[in-house]
């Protein structure tokens, strides 16, 4: 198309970038946790991934660049912290599938860690976002683990989440108010409420 004044508009074809897949849920949770901290409601933090730095290009302190690093030990879960005197520990996962959540998305050591937290009186759960469906679920670790221990397939169908998990609706601030579900659980309610 020719615009007045000879202005040419570039046709920008957006490339699909897979390196940050799963980051939208993480960003929403990070913003939510910042909000909780600002209003002094809870103190929940993203755990750093444990790495061993092997090689550094060190021209100056301000310009140091890590050239080579390795994961030292398997990371446990994404987030942990305190809320109303309770220890909270959880994992956040995204999937583009419309029908199921692949068990390959979560590692055995993470499941064991969540189970240990639950057995020791903490609150452990997994937040799973089905990005294509724009649905985010809060599933208690014990329900997730029970399914995994009895699984005959390598994925969890979405109908399991619809029956056993709590739906987390998107809100402006905080983006994902998962502590509403934690309040419901702490309150001693065993039933599912959406």
Please give the residue ranges for each predicted region.
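Acidic-basic catalytic patches of nuclease active cores, encompassing PD-(D/E)XK
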Residues: 8-67
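Short, solvent-exposed loop/turn segments at secondary-structure junctions
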Residues: 53-54, 97-100, 134
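A short catalytic or substrate-binding loop motif that flags glycine-/basic-rich loops and adjacent residues
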Residues: 70-74
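Conserved catalytic cores of phosphodiester-cleaving nucleases, focusing on short active-site segments
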Residues: 77-98
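Mg2+/Mn2+-dependent nuclease catalytic core
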Residues: 93-120
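Nucleic-acid nuclease catalytic cores
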Residues: 115-145
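Short, electropositive alpha-helical surface patch
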Residues: 139-162
